Swiss-Prot record:
Similarity-based family: Belongs to the universal ribosomal protein uS11 family.
Annotated region described as Disordered, given as residue ranges: 1-22
Record's subunit section: Part of the 30S ribosomal subunit. Interacts with proteins S7 and S18. Binds to IF-3.
Matches recorded under Gene3D superfamilies: Ribosomal protein S11
Superkingdom classification of source: Bacteria
UniProt cross-references to InterPro entries, sorted A to Z: Ribosomal_uS11, Ribosomal_uS11_bac-type, Ribosomal_uS11_CS, Ribosomal_uS11_sf
Function of the molecule: Located on the platform of the 30S subunit, it bridges several disparate RNA helices of the 16S rRNA. Forms part of the Shine-Dalgarno cleft in the 70S ribosome.
Key words, A-Z: Ribonucleoprotein, Ribosomal protein, RNA-binding, rRNA-binding
GO molecular function terms attached to this record: rRNA binding; structural constituent of ribosome
Listed GO biological process terms: translation
Protein's name according to its UniProt entry: Small ribosomal subunit protein uS11
GO cellular component: ribonucleoprotein complex; ribosome
């Protein structure tokens, strides 16, 4: 079955969502409306186990997603970072190194104002 060819983007601006958990880093590039253009993760590249959580794997994932998005016409992104994983800084640097212009960086990690009590382990 043939792969569907993606169309060029109508606007060269978009949003980069970086979800950096303790075990994996997921990079999703969307248009300004929030529709996904492309995505990549440390696991989808081929890393398994503890190697997925490394900053190097996060950088490669961001670079892979950025190259596909640039081919489709993306030039400028707003970066939204979510999570406390080790790969978030490297992912941002890789997006810039791949050729995307970063206009803003937002940390959108949800932080409770002393909400629900966590289960045994995190306490």
């Amino acid at each position: 079955m043939a792969k569907k060819r993606k169309k060029k983007l109508s606007s060269p601006e978009g949003i980069s969502h970086i979800h950096a958990s303790a075990n994996n880093t997921i990079v999703t590039l969307t248009n300004t409306g929030g529709d996904a253009i492309t995505w990549s993760s440390s696991g989808s590249i081929g890393y398994k186990g503890s190697k997925k959580s490394t900053p190097y794997a996060a950088g490669i994932a961001a670079e892979t997603a950025a190259k596909v998005a640039i081919d489709l016409g993306l030039k400028k992104v707003i970066v939204k970072v979510n999570g406390t994983g080790s790969g978030k800084d490297t992912a941002i640097r890789s997006l810039h190194a791949a050729g995307l212009e970063i206009s803003e960086i937002h940390d959108v990690t949800p932080i409770p104002h002393n909400g629900c009590r966590p289960p045994k382990k995190p306490r």
